[in-house]
Structure formats: C-alpha cells, structure tokens
A protein has these predicted regions:
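Short proline/glycine- and basic residue-enriched helix-capping loop/turn segments at helix->loop/beta transitions
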Residues: 112
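N-terminal beta-strand/beta-hairpin edge segment
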Residues: 65-67
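Acidic, Ala/Val/Gly-enriched low-complexity intrinsically disordered segments
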Residues: 11-14, 22-23
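Glycine-rich hexapeptide-repeat left-handed beta-helix
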Residues: 21, 26-39, 72, 78-107, ...
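N-terminal segments that cap or nucleate solenoid repeat domains
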Residues: 26-63
Length: 208
C-alpha cells in the first residue's frame, strides 16, 4: 500500500514539473547526496533515460531514449539547444590528489551528440557534432565548429582545433570544414529542437 502511494506521489511531482517546466520525462531524475539535476525550460528527457546528481541542463536541450548522464563525482553541464541521442553515456572524473579539480563534463551550445556516444570528463565547445559511436576520454578539449566522424576515438587530454573535421581511431585532423558543413552544425541542432518540441506538444496533448 505504501509503495503504491509513494509511486503516486512521485508521479504527481513529475506531472507538476512537466507542467511548469515543459519537461517530457518520468521519475528518472535522481539525486546523488546533496545534488539534484537542474533542468532548464522546454527540456525533453525521455522516460527511459537516467539523469543523476549534479547535472545542469540548459533550455531547449533534448535527451533521447536510453541515455545515462551521471553527475556524481563531478558535474555535467549541457548548453542550450544541444541534443544527446539514443544510447549515449555521459560521465565525469573524480577529484583527486593527482588532479584536484577532476574532470567535469562540459558541453556547449548547439551540440549534436550522436547515437551511442561515450563522453567522459571532457569539454566540448559550441556547434559541434560528435558522430555515432565515438568515444571522448578524460581531459579532451574540443573547440567550436568541429565535426567528429562516426566511430572515432579521441584519446585522453587531446585538443581538437576549431573549424576542422576529425576522424579515426585514434582521431586525426582531416581538413577544414566547408561553409556548408559549418551551417550544417547549426541546422542539426535546430532540427533536434524542432523534433523535441513536437514530442513536448504531443505529451501535453495527452496529459489529463
């Protein structure tokens, strides 16, 4: 009986949160110690995803099915209009004597994180596309306006210069981006904002 009541209370909290913040989600927002995810406006978090601890999600972000974002031993920050696609894993590096600040995970604005990407304690600039299945390790810094090809491995502490296409295992700089490709980075982010809004509108229509 008490378990059933607890589920009803949790569902009510989620319903109120979705009404106020226009968030499409279930009770997959979880605390870690004193930290609870901070969610911006018009955010979509799929019900099958998990967001834990010190995670700061800005306005118009979309988190698609089966994503795990774990801000437990450091923080995760995701900038406006970025999208985290299906099956991706986002985590951080703890603080230690070796590196007192650890490695948070910082994602800029208008970033597209493709399906099944792994991001661990790295920093990503604005208008970046991380191709499907890519892995970015601790201490990686990616500049603005960068494309990373599918299946790439970006080794620990590597820096990717702004304005280039990178690809490979380990990743290598291939060539400068064309103007069309630069525009495509913004197009991708805007498309995911549009699709996210369609999901939110659909969810609002079925709310009692």
């Amino acid at each position: 009986r008490f378990q059933g009541l607890h589920r009803k209370i949790k569902a009510t909290k989620v319903f109120l949160c979705s009404r106020i913040f226009e968030v499409y989600m279930s009770a997959q927002l979880r605390p870690y110690k004193a930290f609870f995810p901070q969610i911006g406006l018009r955010v979509m978090i799929d019900a099958s995803s998990v967001v834990i601890g010190d995670v700061r999600i800005a306005d118009d972000v979309s988190v698609w099915p089966l994503v795990a974002i774990r801000g437990d031993v450091n923080y995760v920050s995701i900038g406006q209009r970025s999208n985290i696609q299906d099956g991706s894993v986002l985590h951080v590096t703890h603080k230690s004597s070796y590196k007192p600040e650890g490695n948070p995970l910082i994602i800029g604005e208008d970033v597209t994180v493709g399906h099944k990407v792994m991001l661990h304690g790295c920093t990503i600039g604005n208008r970046v596309l991380v191709g499907m299945g890519s892995i970015l390790l601790d201490g990686v810094v990616v500049g603005d306006d960068v494309m990373i090809g599918a299946g790439s491995l970006v080794p620990q502490n590597k820096q990717l210069e702004s304005g280039y296409l990178y690809f490979g295992n380990p990743v290598k700089q291939i060539r400068p981006l064309t103007e069309a490709e630069r525009e495509g980075l913004k197009y991708s982010a805007n498309n995911y904002v549009k699709w996210k809004n369609e999901y939110l509108d659909q969810d609002n229509q079925i709310q009692p």
